[in-house]
């Protein structure tokens, strides 16, 4: 990721898709990730209700750390390439910068008081669309509406989604959304 920023600052044009392929090939060649966590870490209930926060759904330790560089408050650390990110929820202010920077789309933002989610998205979605809130398996957990699409120069979009049916701590089970009219029908065999 840092190399891509340097190239852009130098004014050199590079195809973003080519960069992603090269980045994936490099990461794949350097490691064999091991599962470190069974479930992502979350803040305690009191902290979760106090202000926005992020959850890094990184369960495997490998050489990836853009989230730690992205955090302007130093709230995300990795002690080695074989560990997962650790979020200091005392320092995390819920700015969501790490959500934009995660190449694995594994960082998710939450504001439980406002019942809002900040979810990375790589497909076209419009503000105002009604969505199904889903878990990592694509199973429907609830309903929401896309309030805003946040754009950053690195080509990762973050959708600010207002939950209409899920409240408080249950929001942290949500890992994405599917526009209602694009939700696939179950296959019958």
Where are these regions (language model features)?
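Intrinsically disordered, low-complexity, charged/polar segments
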Residues: 171-189
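A generic structural signal for residues embedded in beta-strands
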Residues: 132-134
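Short beta-strand-centered aromatic/proline hotspots
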Residues: 139-152
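Ferredoxin-like iron-sulfur electron-transfer modules
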Residues: 14-27, 39-63, 74-94, 109-124
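C-type cytochrome heme c attachment motif
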Residues: 66-73, 93-101
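Short, structured interface segments
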Residues: 4-10, 87, 95-111
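Short, solvent-exposed secondary-structure boundary/capping segments
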Residues: 152-164
């Amino acid at each position: 990721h840092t190399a891509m920023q340097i190239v852009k600052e130098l004014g050199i044009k590079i195809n973003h898709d080519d960069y992603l392929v090269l980045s994936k090939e490099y990461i794949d060649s350097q490691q064999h990730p091991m599962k470190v966590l069974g479930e992502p870490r979350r803040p305690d209930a009191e902290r979760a209700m106090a202000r926005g926060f992020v959850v890094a759904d990184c369960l495997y330790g490998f050489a990836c750390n853009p989230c730690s560089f992205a955090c302007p408050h130093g709230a995300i650390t990795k002690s080695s390439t074989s560990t997962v990110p650790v979020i200091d929820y005392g320092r995390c202010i819920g700015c969501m910068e790490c959500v934009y920077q995660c190449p694995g789309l594994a960082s998710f933002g939450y504001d439980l008081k406002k019942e809002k989610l900040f979810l990375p998205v790589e497909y076209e979605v419009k503000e105002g669309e009604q969505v199904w809130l889903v878990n990592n398996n694509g199973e429907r957990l609830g309903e929401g509406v896309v309030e805003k699409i946040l754009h950053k120069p690195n080509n990762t979009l973050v959708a600010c989604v207002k939950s209409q049916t899920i409240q408080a701590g249950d929001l942290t089970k949500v890992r994405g959304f599917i526009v209602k009219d694009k939700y696939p029908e179950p296959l019958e065999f």
